[in-house]
């Protein structure tokens, strides 16, 4: 039985008893931000669970209650932030209070009890790990010497294979192609091995990525209702999590063992495992390395493929933008044959297309949850100040912020020109109307790797091919419906047909 349904069967009788005997005490002083009324014991659990789209539901709450909304999932208080001003308050002004992470069951287990950099609570260990990632793994020098050749080789390889598909007049599943590209780049960068389109290795790798996602978004009763934690065992979720962890740990260990072999052929460039093994010590154990690999795999593959799929969706739905982007790229590159990273400064419209894609279709519609470490006072103005308790989970809705008409003119339209008018807006978490990768202490450490891959791939896709919908389908038939989850996936797969562009 699904853990959610099993929990609900048991929870409602308890909620009824709770309602009979519970009398809310009067609280003196500042109150929590407003929000929809919940039920005793379960809070707003039933409302969130029945919502077909969590990010759409949170957006609707911001329209009704404002930029700060209070929810409760069982014993866990939740704060939803939906404006640039309040995002700045959380991500910058009071960052130290809001910079921890909730210790969610799935994330904690797969990150070796919080040894990673993305999901770990704010601890001394996290600070050491973050410093190592910033100063050793994702430096600008390493991006140029180690990452760039891999990116350019894998994008060229994808373009060559797509050219064969175009010659055969076949349709392609865009996300599958982009996912394969991202997987090949990340696997080569991380451990010097490509997991290709076919074969047992690729199947195993993709299966593990799928299980990681399932465990991250899966419902563990113990996260919200600790007294019912035993349901996780009864429902099978705990056993599934243990199996997933065991499989991942074995996979990581195999990779590390391969790198430790004395007769291993030396690669001309270091991969991330090489770098980590050279820095192994008290604050960087093998478990820490495995936890970092989790972040690289999970964050690097899905985000790149998702953004590329949404970029192509938006361009196909907006043919004028598509044509303008292609004209820019082809006029700059000419008959050189491909776009490389040195060409980026001459392609401002292309880069604006990527930014606009992540505004309208943010890779994470709700940023990875934060958790307050102490009480906080927050509000839009002095007449609307609220108290936020310690251990409150904080959701920052990029879906709502990117669609805010107070910030963006015609927010539902795909208009890359808005970023040409605001060249100061970047990915560094400095303008809080646009923070697709977060900001402050928790900003994504691998921004440059991900964004550069998207820009390089998209530029070459638009340079080399014209794009059409499948036979019998019109451009206006391409939808932008979304699924529910941590990442903003397309509900319906995007099938498109490449047609090789021939210069006159």
From Swiss-Prot:
Keyword Metal-binding in the entry? The reply is yes
What subcellular compartments does it reside in? Microsome membrane
Q: Which SUPFAM superfamilies match?
A: Cytochrome P450 (SSF48264)
Its placement in the membrane is given as:
Single-pass membrane protein
Signal peptide as annotated in the record: none
UniProt cofactor(s): heme
Q: Name one GO biological process term.
A: coumarin biosynthetic process
An example GO CC term for this entry is: endoplasmic reticulum
Record keywords: Endoplasmic reticulum, Heme, Iron, Membrane, Metal-binding, Microsome, Monooxygenase, Oxidoreductase, Transmembrane, Transmembrane helix
Q: Where are the transmembrane segments?
A: 1-21
Protein name (Swiss-Prot/TrEMBL): 6,7,8-trihydroxycoumarin synthase
Q: Which organism is it from?
A: Pastinaca sativa
In the UniProt record, what gene is named as encoding this protein? CYP71AZ3
